[in-house]
Design a protein with these regions (language model features):
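Terminal amphipathic alpha-helical/low-complexity segments used for targeting or macromolecular assembly
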Residues: 1-122, 181, 187-188, 192-206
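Structural signal for interior beta-strand "rungs" in well-ordered beta-sheet cores
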Residues: 54, 119-213
Length: 213
């Protein structure tokens, strides 16, 4: 039986990834010799037996106790909070390990290329939205009712915006789901690369942002 890879609204999931490969990527010993596949990486609460999760802070110990994940990236100090059904994978730096595995599942999550297929809003399915001048819209964008969009704003592919939202001028929205009744001010950038990185001797390691932190 081939299981469907978990879908993601913005990035393509390249799973499954085996436990053997996870250990190879992280340069750690594989204590389990049997072949186990992971279909996604998820937070403690969302994870299931087919996904790998992570536990990096004691403040999440109550959630960790109830996780449904079969394996968890964690530290030696935190491993005893995990339930019996969840095997710890001990690493020196949990978040750096999460970044490395997330990059394998979602390699294009580290890219920050602009959407070169945007259209003028007048030529898109969102033309009925009240908008200013020079507004650009990507493919598969959904905008709810009673929304306003200011001048020179770009809303890139797959972005969903709820009802009663106000988007300011000179704003870029990418890789985002905006709920109802949200106001975004002028000159905002949402969904692009953030400040998530880990210092390294050779170069900074970028932390992929896929909505699990």
């Amino acid at each position: 039986l081939i299981k469907a890879v978990m879908s993601h609204p913005f990035f393509l999931n390249k799973g499954p990834i085996s436990l053997v490969k996870v250990c190879d990527f992280l340069k750690i010993a594989n204590q389990k010799k049997n072949e186990i596949n992971f279909y996604d990486i998820k937070d403690l609460q969302s994870a299931n037996k087919d996904s790998i999760t992570f536990f990096h802070s004691k403040k999440y110990k109550e959630v960790a106790k109830t996780t449904k994940a079969s394996f968890c990236l964690t530290s030696d100090l935190l491993k005893d909070f995990l339930p019996k059904n969840c095997e710890p994978i001990i690493v020196n730096n949990v978040l750096a390990a999460v970044a490395r595995i997330t990059e394998e599942f979602y390699p294009n999550s580290l890219e920050d290329e602009f959407d070169n297929k945007v259209l003028n809003i007048e030529d898109s399915d969102c033309k009925s939205v009240i908008h200013g001048k020079n507004v650009l819209i990507g493919e598969n964008v959904e905008i709810g009712t009673n929304c306003l969009i200011g001048h020179n704003t770009i809303i890139e592919k797959n972005v969903h915006i709820g009802d009663n939202c106000k988007i300011g001028s000179n704003t870029i929205i990418r890789n985002s789901i905006i709920r109802n009744n949200v106001s975004i001010l002028d000159n905002c950038i949402i969904g692009k690369k953030g400040f998530g990185f880990f210092p390294n001797k050779k170069k900074n390691l970028r932390y992929p942002h896929i909505g699990i932190v």
